[in-house]
Amino acid sequence: MSPRMSAEDRRAQVIAEAITVFARFGYEGATTAAIAERVGVSQPYLFRLFPTKKDLFLAASEKNMNDTLSLMREAAGGKTGHDALDAMGQAYSEKLTSHREWLLMQLQTFAACYDEDVQRQTRLCLQEIWDEVEKLSGLQIEDRVIFFAKGMFCNVIAAAGRLDGQDEQWTPVLEALKAHTGRVHD
């Protein structure tokens, strides 16, 4: 028999499994029963950790956004300017293709912004990412806007299954996205 898991470790496990379920089914379509089953706990226990489905969705969404923030910090790795944006863009693009649930959870979070609590948290998380990219790159707002716009376009292309470069029609688009990640001013 395995040792008992601490509540903190169990919360992390629940959030990880919730991301998988919410990424696939969205806020409305996902059930706490499915999440509890994936974790191997009862629904009453799940609700002791997260009193409502919304609380669990918010925790999963925040974890997903924090992973994006960490990715940007790690990718920049002391670089500044366009070099930082290029490194962050490359890391982001790679994660989009290697961690589909991460992408889908982002999209499900945006789709759930009809809910004021989700919308508020999403704004705060996006602001934190925006501020960090500004701090890491030191670039003008126009460069950062293009960087974020390209990232959102990459989200759509990845969701449609075309970020992998396997479709010749999309090759020029992908090359343009990868070239000079956020350059307005050279």
Residue ranges, per PLM feature:
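Helix-loop "lid/cap" segments that line or gate small-molecule binding pockets
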Residues: 90-97, 105-115
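Hydrophobic alpha-helical connector segments
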Residues: 59, 66, 70-100
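N-terminal intrinsically disordered/low-complexity leader segments
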Residues: 1-7, 172-186
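Helix-turn-helix
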Residues: 13, 17-55, 59
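Hydrophobic alpha-helical segments that form the core
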Residues: 101-107, 126-180
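Residues at secondary-structure transition points
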Residues: 1-9, 13, 51, 55, ...
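Solvent-exposed, amphipathic alpha-helical segments
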Residues: 17, 21-24, 71-75, 105, ...
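Amphipathic alpha-helical packing segments from all-alpha helical-bundle domains
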Residues: 66-70, 96-98, 115-142
